[in-house]
Each structure stands twice: as C-alpha cells, then as structure tokens.
Regions:
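Secretory targeting and sorting signals
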Residues: 1-31, 75, 215
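Solvent-exposed, charged interface segments at domain starts and junctions
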Residues: 31, 62-78, 82-83, 87-91, ...
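Gly/Pro-rich cap/lid or specificity-loop segments adjacent to the active site
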Residues: 36-329, 388-525
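Alpha/beta-hydrolase-fold enzymes
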Residues: 288-390
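An N-terminal domain-start capping segment
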Residues: 13, 18, 26-27, 42-56, ...
Length: 525
C-alpha cells in the first residue's frame, strides 16, 4: 500500500511452463461464469504466445536510467483477457542474470514492491549494488522487475495534469466545516472524471486479477515453468490473487507486509483499518522522540511531542512554511515515520532543525519540486494507478453519509491519517467505470507452501492481514517480527527473518511451525 499526495490532501495506501499449462480457474464471483471462462482461456492463449516469443533482452533505453549489466525488454499482453486477440499493451520488464553457476541457477525471481502503482524496475539493482542481504539469492535467481499495467513504461495512465497534481499547498485534509467537506468531495469527483477522460479505455482492465494474469504471461515469456515471486505490501495481494488463480504455476512465493485478502476488506475497510494502525505506529514514534529529547528537543513526553505536532500543523495552516508546506504536505512528509523505522531519526532531525530555526530542510523534504518534471509525472501516474486499481477491484460505498459517519468517528480516536486517507480514496465513490467483486482468495490444488513475513505493528498493512492470509493459504508459514513496525521486513536488519527468507528461496524449506522473531534494534538518534 502506498504513500502519496492526492487531491486536496496527502494520503496513504497503503512497498510456469513454456506453455501456460492447465487452464486457471476463473475468479470466483469476480465475473459472470461466462466472462470468467473467457478470461481464463485468454490468459492461456496470451501465455502460449509469450512463451513462443520470449523476451528480446537488450540494453535499457538511456532515459530509463537503468545501466548495464541490467537488461530491459517487453512482454505483450491483452488489454482485455476476455478478448486475447484484441488490443495488446506492452509491459516493461528488466533483469539481472544470476551471479551463480549454471548448476546454482534456479530460475527467475519476479518482484512487485506494492502500491498499487509501484514499479518493480529497481529490483535488479540489488545485485548491482551487491547488497549482502541478497547475495545468496542472487546466485540462484535472475532478479526480474516489471512495470505493472498502467505504471511507468507499461501503457501508463493519468488522471490529472502532473503539475496540477503536485502543486502546493493543498487544503488541510482535516475539515473545519461542511464547506470544507463539500470542497473535498468536489475535488474527488473531478479526479474520478479526469481518470475517465484521460485513461478511460484502461480503467475496466486495471484490476488486480488482470495484473495477476499479466504476471503469468511474464512467467511464460521468461521461459519459466513455474513462478518464483516476492511481493511486498500491495504486492502481497497480487501474490495472493496469483496463487488463487494459478496455484499449479507457483514454485516459491514470499509475501511481506500483507494486505488482508478477505473480500469484505478490499478496499474500503482496509483503509479504515489502516487509519487505526497508523495512529498506533505514530504513537510509537512520538514515544521514541520523547525518549530521545536530549537529541531533538521536541518534547520529553509523548504528550508534549503531540502538542508540538499540533502546534506545527496550526502554524503551517495559518502561514504555509516557505509558502508551500501546509498541513497536507506535513502529513505527506511525517507519515514516513510510521511507515519505516529507518525514517525515525531523519524525520525527527528535520523537525528539530526546523524548531531551531532551519526551515529549509523541512521545505526541501515536504514540498514538491515543480522543476522535477519526470518525478512529478511519475508521482501522478503512481497515484492514478493506485486509484484505478483499488476502485476497479471492488464495489465501494456510494453514500457520502457512510463515508462521513465512518471517518468522523475514526478521526476522534485516530486523527493522524484518517481524513487524509478518506479524501485519497473518495474518487471510488463516484468511479465512472466497472467495479468488480473481489476474488475469494483460497488455497488451490497444487499450491506449494507460501512464506508470509510480517511485523506486528506495521502501519500500512496491519498484522491481522498476515494472519488472515495464513489461514486461507493452507500449508503456509508465518514469520512474525514481534513488537516491530517497519513496513517491508525482508532484507532489513533482522537475521531471524532474513535467514528464513534465504533458506526458503534457496531450498523451499520452511520451519515446521510458525516462527516469532524478536524485534530488530530500535533506531538510534
């Protein structure tokens, strides 16, 4: 699940055979039986074609900023799997070949970082940078990244002019009046209309099951009999959907920081639950800042840190910092701390420096760079994909009374993120395209053990999601980092977690029972 700025506020999301093989089961309840059968046949046809065509690997285009020895290529997929011979779109993929011997190589490891709307094209760089946490896996696997449909170089979608999207300051996401709410509702409806105007042809085909089908076509194009997959955040839901649709096509699957896959959680309830988890982790960070008051001088109790935050918000609302940083931009910056432990010290330092008179560091961190054209296009695209996927995946409440009631209630106890998250997702209430019924994620015949990794205090994907997927994927193993909260645990600093991920990827073996790891060390100021 992703973090970004949207509309009038800042918000979060929430990081096979050469021939496709047996026909995948259609998504239960996601389509009519007839349409689901057509999509199942369509993905088989597309995978057959991709297996025959392969991927023409070559140096990456210069403007992609991906240097050799990483290679890039394209995989063609149907826009609509019910019409496999209709319009095709091209998906960008890249790879770094395994560093081991021919005997050590086990295939390709395909990665999705989450979002929805995140690009996986940076994944192969983990080999180039010689990250020691990935050395063993790099000997066994080609590291493969891709831009999912609608993202980056893969038929990118857009909902609003990028310069308009990033302009600041935006309205305070916490409404002071009914007029404030009406203004935000208007922005949300206009944003949804903009998606239809700029990207209408793509919108009905931006679902997670569509991307899972793309993943199976990529598998076939890679020449892989079965898929090895690493998914983080939203990538865990993509993996869960893939595992349900194509259980016999999975070889190894690691899912890290898990979206709750229950049908009634996708996606409205997921975002409400996220508001609660963000407040919990925000409180953890405030306590840490208070414990380290000698370094930061923000407040020596969590209550004083909270008061300092409210004072900062109020001042920025009255007079935006540098003319561009108001409450929305502050939330967009400060939410890094609940997301990632690695952001705790840098975020506190910038805040401390601001209180000491250095405003520029906070402006640089929180305000958009209007001169960064490429970055702003990417940010707008990522937000458009986030919205399109979540709105298309499920039927959302259309009654403003329900949205207002639920978020007003939540804000009373969990104020840090609630309204920002609500406005970010409100376009789904007036979504101008098809909304499906989520897939019933379950263990299918032939699905191997899946490794699930999760910290208990994750803000973006609450721990209950990992427990739910563990119940649904029989034979899976759950590795829990207790009393920790970083979003995306794999490859960080906990050897208890990393050793089990390595062992699973290299051997397919898991512990006989679920494992609870002690937390990694608390960040130092």
């Amino acid at each position: 699940m992703r973090r970004t700025a949207v509309l009038g506020s800042a918000g979060t999301l929430i990081a096979g055979t050469l021939i496709a093989g047996a026909m995948a089961a259609p998504a239960a309840g996601a389509d009519s039986r007839h349409h689901g059968d057509r999509e199942a046949r369509g993905v088989q046809i597309a995978a057959d074609r991709a297996a025959d065509a392969g991927i023409d690997w070559a140096d990456c285009p210069a403007d992609w900023a991906i240097a050799a020895p990483i290679q890039c290529g394209w995989v063609s997929v149907p826009l609509d799997y019910a019409k496999p011979n209709g319009k095709q779109i091209k998906l960008a993929v890249d790879r770094h070949v395994s560093t081991g011997t021919k005997e050590e190589r086990q295939g390709a490891l395909v990665y999705n970082p989450g979002g929805p709307g995140g690009s996986g094209m940076a994944f192969p760089k983990r080999i180039v940078t010689k990250n020691p946490l990935w050395t063993k896996a790099a000997k066994a696997y080609d590291f493969v990244g891709f831009d999912p449909r609608g993202v980056g170089h893969s038929a990118p979608i857009s909902c609003i002019d990028p310069q308009e999207f990033v302009k600041a300051p935006k309205a305070d996401p916490v409404p002071d009046s009914e007029a404030d709410k009406r203004a935000q509702r208007k922005l949300a409806a206009e944003y949804a209309d903009g998606c239809a105007e700029r990207s209408g042809e793509m919108l009905p085909h931006m679902t997670t099951p569509d991307t899972a089908r793309d993943l199976d076509v990529i598998r076939a194009a890679l020449g892989e009999k079965k898929l090895n997959f690493l998914g983080v955040s939203y990538g865990t839901y993509l993996g869960a959907v893939y595992g349900t649709l194509f259980p016999t096509h999975v070889r190894r699957m690691v899912v890290d920081s898990v979206v709750n896959p229950a049908k009634d959680n996708i996606w409205y309830e997921a975002n409400l639950n996220q508001d609660v988890a963000f407040q919990t982790r925000w409180n953890d960070w405030k306590a840490w800042v208070a414990q380290n008051d000698a370094a930061y001088h923000i407040g020596d109790t969590p209550e004083k840190v909270e008061q300092a935050w409210l004072t900062l918000r109020a001042a920025a609302k009255k007079n935006p910092i540098g003319g561009v940083v108001g409450p929305a931009e502050l939330i967009g910056f400060f939410q890094s701390a609940p997301y990632y432990d690695s952001a705790w010290a840098p975020t506190a330092r910038i805040w401390s420096d601001y209180l000491g008179g250095d405003t520029q560091a906070l402006i640089d961190a929180a305000a958009p760079d209007l001169s960064d054209t490429a970055g702003n296009i990417s940010a707008e695209n990522g937000n458009a994909v986030y919205t399109a996927v979540e709105c298309a995946d499920a039927k959302w409440p259309t009654s403003w009374k329900k949205w207002d009631r639920d978020n007003t209630r939540l804000h009373q106890q969990y104020p840090f993120m609630t309204w920002a998250n609500a406005w970010m997702n409100l376009p789904c209430a007036t979504w101008p395209s098809t909304q499906r019924t989520p897939l019933d994620v379950r263990t299918g015949k032939g699905l191997p053990p899946v490794l699930i990794v999760q910290s208990t205090r994750d803000a973006a994907t609450p721990y209950e999601g990992a427990v739910e997927l563990h119940k649904r994927f029989k034979g899976s193993r759950l590795v829990t980092e207790k009393d920790a909260g970083s979003h995306g645990v794999t490859g960080l600093v906990n050897p208890c977690v990393n050793e089990r991920v390595d062992t699973y990827l290299l051997t397919g073996k898991t512990d006989r029972h679920d494992v609870t790891c002690t937390p990694h060390a608390t960040p130092k100021p």
